[in-house]
Structures are given as C-alpha cells and as structure tokens.
C-alpha cells in the first residue's frame, strides 16, 4: 500500500480479517472468540459515551445474545467481504485502528420485532488484541428490546 505522512489503509490484512471473524463469532453467539480477541485492559465506549471494562462489555454482548435471534450483519456494496465493510488504518504514530460499517439485523426475542439499523465501530489494536472499542449508532433498538425484556422479567 502507498505510504504517506498519514499512514496507510488496508482491507485485506490480518486485522481486518480478524474483525470479519469477530462479527461471524457474534452471529454464531461464540463468546469465546470475543473473550480471546479483546485485551483484558479493554476500554469500551458505547454510543452514549458510557465507558465499560472487558467484563462489563462481555456481559453486554451476552445480553444481546439473550435479546435477539437470527443476528446477521448485512452485505455491504462497499466491500469484498460478505456482509461487512472493514478497513484497517496503520497510522504513522504507531496506532492501528480497524473500522467497520455494516447493518445489524435480527429478531427481538421479547418484542418480536424484526430489526435492522446501520452502525459504525472503531477498534484500536495493541499487538494482536483489541484494547479499545468505540461504537457509533442509534441505541433505540437495543433500548426497546431491553425494556421489553425487563418488563417480562418483573
């Protein structure tokens, strides 16, 4: 890839492929892959700016598994990968960030709603582990499903 003062972007490197695998693991509800790829020192920031540690993040993913069936990530016209547009930027300052643009699709177990919404997530790498995740999307779907779940559990 051509280099400049900024860095360079790759769509077919190891880290981009790992993020594709990460989303396949979410579709398969394979929490073990997530526990492995995320650093023990993970700093996770949700779309509302709330910061969580790794244990809190994993619990949140397990809650998504509980709230939704048939989770899939929609094909993107911008990508060679099925379902995902993923790119990794290798900055000249040494930071490596992988970004994904996709759609979350699934069926709410508590509302019965078929849901679909676009999202963007950025991942900062430290070696072969993800040390930071920052999410950008509307949480309305998750909030509604969580509310329905809590109401049913009362």
Q: Across the structure, where does each feature detected by a protein language model lie?
A:
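Sec-exported extracytoplasmic/periplasmic mature domains
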Residues: 24-28, 39-43, 62-70
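Surface-exposed, charged secondary-structure patches
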Residues: 58-111
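A mature extracytoplasmic/lumenal domain signature
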Residues: 38, 48, 102-104, 121, ...
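Low-complexity, intrinsically disordered terminal/linker segments enriched in charged
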Residues: 131-154
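Short, solvent-exposed coil/turn segments at beta-strand boundaries
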Residues: 123-130
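Short, low-complexity N-terminal intrinsically disordered segments enriched in polar/charged residues
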Residues: 1-32, 36, 153-154
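Short, surface-exposed coil-to-beta transition loops
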Residues: 114-120
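A short gly/proline-enriched turn/hairpin at secondary-structure junctions
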Residues: 5, 37, 41-53, 67
């Amino acid at each position: 890839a051509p280099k400049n003062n900024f860095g360079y972007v790759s769509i077919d490197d190891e880290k981009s492929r790992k993020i594709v695998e990460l989303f396949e693991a979410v579709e398969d509800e394979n929490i073990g892959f997530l526990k492995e790829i995320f650093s023990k020192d993970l700093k996770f920031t949700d779309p509302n700016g709330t910061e969580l540690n790794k244990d809190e993040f994993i619990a949140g993913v397990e809650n998504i598994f509980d709230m939704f069936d048939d989770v899939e990530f929609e094909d993107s016209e911008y990508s060679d990968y099925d379902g995902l547009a993923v790119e990794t930027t290798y900055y000249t300052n040494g930071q490596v960030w992988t970004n994904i643009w996709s759609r979350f699709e699934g069926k709410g177990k508590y509302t019965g709603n078929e849901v679909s919404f676009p999202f963007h997530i950025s991942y900062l790498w430290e070696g072969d582990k993800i040390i930071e995740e920052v999410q950008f999307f509307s949480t309305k779907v998750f909030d509604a499903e969580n509310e329905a779940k809590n109401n049913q559990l009362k």
